[in-house]
Amino acid sequence: MLDRRESAVNAVIAMAKGTAAVAIGAAALMGQSVQGAPAAAFPDPSRVAKLSSAFEDVDRTFRAYADREHIPGAVWGIVIDGRLAHVGVTGYRDVAAKSPVDSGTIFRIASMTKSFTALAILKLRDEGKLSLDDPAEKWVPELARLRYPTTDSPKITIRHLMSHAEGFPEDNPWGDQQLAVTDEQMSRMMREGIPFSNAPGVAYEYSNYGFAILGRIVTKASGMPYRRYISQTILRPLGMTSTTLEPRDVPAGRIAQGYRWEDEQWKLEPQLPDGAFGSMGGMLTSARDLGVYVGMYLSAWPPHDGPETGPVKRSSMREMQQVQRPRPASVTRASNGALQLYNGGYAFGLGVSGDCNFAHIVAHSGGLPGFGSLMRWLPEYGVGIIAFGNRTYTNWAGPASDAFAIMLKTGGLVPRIPQPSAVLTARREAVSRLVMQWDDRLADSLAAVNLFLDRSRDRRKAEIEKLRAEVGPCRAGTGFDVVENALRGQWTMPCDRGALRVSITLAPTAPA
């Protein structure tokens, strides 16, 4: 019976006259502007304390994994609300010298560099220096001689390169060994041609080459070398003083040596120098610096008022965290044996996915000879994980998933809840009055143009009066049960013989 009553009320007041432009509606009702619209917020004031209670178990998880996988040294961290809240370490940065890893040890992060490159491109776009839909050959003339796979293939654009949709073949680990090539060598490679595995714009295929070309575009559009542009416009404003593209810039007492596990022993891998392919995988950084970097992306959520404080606009950082090129769904098995369904795709220099626990996961891993790294965060939860290891292609995906599962059990890993706009709250109060005592003039003032065309006012009045007769006199209740967004919500009206569930969606119109 309750379900029938709920659906009836929903149908009766499915649309109330409001506004999709909250500023106009709020000003008419409450004297507020859109800048006063509340941002989504965390409901539990003890959330951070609960998350902190998971740190010891997270440390045990990462240490056990490092031991099991023969990782010489590892660092991991947890970022909460834009701050590096915890760092854990184990093992050695230099096996021969028995030099331990610490929170300031600097590791290569390989393909995680791609997000820095994408961020630089969006910054240049925001400054009007390029368009994502520019043909890549506008900035890299060597690409004008490419032989496309079909006569109807579009020219490769910057957008294609940013989302691995340019049609180049997957090139791991070939790309790793190209880091040190010179600009002239790269130009010669491009002039000699690049084969296509797909026409541009039709499929995702991971391309280190594509992000190397983006580095060339950053250089051309900014008027300064890629490395300098990244340092001056992104790293320096963020205070990332331990981050660089050149291993020779790192003090010997801080750099992690890279190893491979072979013949039951660790074997030293040479440090690959920076070169023309650095924009796809050359970055080195520390846990502190990467915590700042991940915190920057988390700070872009939720959309909110206030000055821009980062090197790139918050809206552009959110754009980076939205799927641009979908990938097929996959099923994997978690460490506890549970099946997990993943869907998502590639964004701009970042991967985006969803699973059975979290709808929006942003991440990128990195792997080079001697190193493996990961950054992963949950925008709606304000929490991220970072990890570094100095063994070839260390895969941190499993421990990171386990760490989120541990935090989930504390009850502190919860998403922000949307807050109602002033106009939605005003409409809830008015609709509650209408349900308690029908008034034709009030109904007319609330109704969107469709409401009484879909079903006449007299019929809707009769339906509400019938419900009220069944459950008895009703009261307005206090607040919303569910706020889906600033203009849609549900609440409960307690009645003498039951309750009514009410939902409203405000129409995309401004009040007269």
Task: Name each model-derived stretch.
Residues 363, 374-377, 381-390, 502-503, ...:
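Short, well-ordered beta-strand elements
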Residues 2-22:
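Bacterial N-terminal signal peptides that target proteins for export
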Residues 479-512:
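Exposed beta-sheet edge and beta->alpha loop/turn motif
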Residues 48-109, 129-131, 145-146, 183, ...:
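Short, conserved catalytic-motif segment at the N-terminal edge
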Residues 59-62, 76, 82, 108-133, ...:
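Active-site SXXK
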